[in-house]
């Protein structure tokens, strides 16, 4: 049981007459003591807590958060809307203030995330619905298809060479071209090709 007599804001800070402020403070204390006599103990309750954790966004911050949690034994679902993790840091050449190679910094982190037994990667995915309560949320995640079998793709890039359709590169923000089926970028994670379904001849014709 607890009750606060706020003698700082209501006495000390607002009155210049110390004697009268002291009388008021004593009255507030007596009132708080009298009130707490009528309080009922809150007690304690136990609630179920889901120890699985969802991290939305697999940029540098999301990856670090996932690794910290996974290393502490939590199972982490890492949701990323793009085909690869890494975020905008994978697009940078150098990083301030150390002028380090950006990919040299982020690539080991990406691989560590991908190989961590407590992290489940969900790429091409977005959260579409949440429900539940603190400690026990339920989340619906929409996963878009790659149209490539991840168990068979080796990331060799031969499919990209054979594809006849050229499109602006999403990774390079349209500054160059890629193919309708492509590896998002060098050293991407997961290193699996993805097909742009809106321009692929096979998918659009069927």
Identify the residue ranges that each predicted region occupies:
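Non-heme iron-sulfur electron-transfer modules
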Residues: 1-7, 40-45, 82-108, 122-152, ...
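C-terminal boundary of histidine-terminating zinc-finger modules
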Residues: 17
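A short, basic/flexible loop-to-alpha-helix module at the beginning of a structural domain
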Residues: 34-51
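N-terminal Rossmann-like FAD-binding beta1-loop-alpha1 element of flavoenzymes
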Residues: 52-78
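Residue-level detector of alpha-helix initiation sites
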Residues: 59-61, 84, 158
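C-type cytochrome heme c attachment motif
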Residues: 77, 155-162
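A structural motif corresponding to the C-terminal end of an alpha-helix
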Residues: 112-120
């Amino acid at each position: 049981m607890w009750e606060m007599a706020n003698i700082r804001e209501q006495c000390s800070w607002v009155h210049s007459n110390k004697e009268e402020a002291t009388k008021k403070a004593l009255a507030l204390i007596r009132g708080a003591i009298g009130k707490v006599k009528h309080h009922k103990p809150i007690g304690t309750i136990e609630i179920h807590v889901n120890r699985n954790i969802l991290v939305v966004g697999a940029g540098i911050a999301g990856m670090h958060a996932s690794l910290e949690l996974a290393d502490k034994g939590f199972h982490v679902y890492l949701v990323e809307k793009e085909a690869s993790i890494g975020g905008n840091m994978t697009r940078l050449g150098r990083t301030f203030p150390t002028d380090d190679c950006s990919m040299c910094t982020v690539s080991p982190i990406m691989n560590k995330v991908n190989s961590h037994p407590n992290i489940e990667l969900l790429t091409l995915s977005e959260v579409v619905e949440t429900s539940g309560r603190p400690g026990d949320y339920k989340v619906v995640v929409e996963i878009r298809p790659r149209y490539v079998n991840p168990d068979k793709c080796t990331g060799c890039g031969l499919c990209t060479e054979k594809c006849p359709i050229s499109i602006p590169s999403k990774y390079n923000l349209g500054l160059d071209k890629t193919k309708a089926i492509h590896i998002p970028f060098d050293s991407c994670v997961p290193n699996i090709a993805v097909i742009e379904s809106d321009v692929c001849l096979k998918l659009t014709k069927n």
